[in-house]
Regions:
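FAD-binding subdomain of flavoenzyme oxidoreductases
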Residues: 1
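Alpha-helical interface subdomain recognition
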Residues: 4-27, 33-175
Length: 175
């Protein structure tokens, strides 16, 4: 592998020490750009997971009875589901915008980073709300909610932690 073939080797140079990004902003873009696709895929996956969690939760809320009626007919449950749907739609809009920009070949590091940050937080919150609505059943494997909660917890870590996403966003904003 030559430095021309290996972006990280080219970026590090012969000394092996990576130069400060402030010194070579074009190199920073070359190194960070491939991560955009990974983060975009994570955002897309989270959007799908959120949609599925909402569907499963609504179905459960219409099926589960308490005090002679489905729990989905109680205001508190409706409010939880409304919050879940709102978070999911906002995350979907950010993700679709980032995907459009990426597809058009535009510089979209900021938008992709925002989509990754927001979707991973949202899917974790939605999984938690779904678990709350399912109650004890949410811990049982046959409902799949316990797995969704575990899977959602990886999002704020994998592909760059939330803190890394915030650092990237701060830099793209000139800070």
């Amino acid at each position: 592998i030559t430095p021309d073939d290996d972006l990280l080797a080219a970026f590090a140079g012969a000394s092996g020490a990576a130069p400060a990004f402030e010194e070579q902003p074009e190199e920073e873009a070359r190194v960070i750009a491939p991560f955009a696709w990974e983060r975009l895929l994570m955002a897309i996956g989270a959007v799908g997971a959120m949609q599925r969690l909402i569907e499963v939760t609504v179905a459960y809320a219409l099926e589960r009875q308490a005090f002679g009626r489905p729990i989905g007919k109680f205001q508190a449950i409706r409010h939880h589901v409304a919050e879940m749907a709102t978070k999911a739609e906002a995350a979907r809009a950010l993700t679709y915008n980032a995907l459009r920009l990426f597809h058009e070949g535009q510089d979209c590091i900021q938008e992709v980073t925002m989509a990754k940050l927001v979707t991973q937080r949202a899917v974790l919150e939605i999984a938690d709300q779904s678990l709350q609505i399912h109650g004890g059943y949410g811990y049982m494997r046959e409902y799949g909610i316990e797995r969704a909660v575990r899977d959602a917890r990886l999002g704020p870590i994998g592909g760059g932690t939330d803190e890394v996403m915030k650092e990237i966003l701060g830099k793209t904003m000139g800070l």
